[in-house]
Regions:
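Residues that form generic nucleotide/phosphate-binding pockets
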Residues: 12, 27-30, 97, 101
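Conserved catalytic core of Hanks-type protein kinase domains
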Residues: 15, 30-31, 88
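A short, surface-exposed loop/turn module that caps and links secondary-structure elements
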Residues: 29-56
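A general secondary-structure junction signal
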Residues: 7, 43-44, 89
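Residue-level detector of beta-strand structural context in well-folded domains
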Residues: 1, 49-51, 62
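Enriched for short, Lys/Arg-rich terminal
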Residues: 55-61, 65-106
């Protein structure tokens, strides 16, 4: 599956130092290899999944939306399916910022 990085995700990655950028890239690749590796959210964030990883004893979260099961069942080539990566960051204000971005995107 291919990653599709949304602006908040890309902005955060640009601002951080190289070792963390590489850790984020590795985590995104893990998600692309297995989209169900994270935890599905409910309520306001239904359809969004969050994958947690650690870097230098700090926990980071990646919010993403995997392809729907219907699109996977329809025989679409796995390499053509996109995973939308919305946000990455530490837990502080993560969900509030994510909700604000998703609301503005609609």
């Amino acid at each position: 599956m291919k990653p599709n990085y949304k602006p908040p995700f890309s902005r955060f990655v640009k601002k951080v130092h190289k070792p963390l950028q590489l850790a984020i890239e590795d985590a995104a690749e893990e998600v692309c290899d297995n989209p169900e590796i994270g935890e599905a959210k409910a309520g306001d964030l239904a359809g969004i999944w969050v994958y947690k990883f650690k870097f230098n004893r700090q926990e980071y979260l990646i919010a993403y939306r995997p392809p729907t099961p219907e699109s996977r069942r329809q025989g679409v080539d796995v390499e053509l399916l996109m995973i939308d990566f919305y946000q990455v960051g530490s837990h502080e204000n993560f969900y509030g910022e994510l909700k604000r971005y998703l609301k503005s995107e609609r």
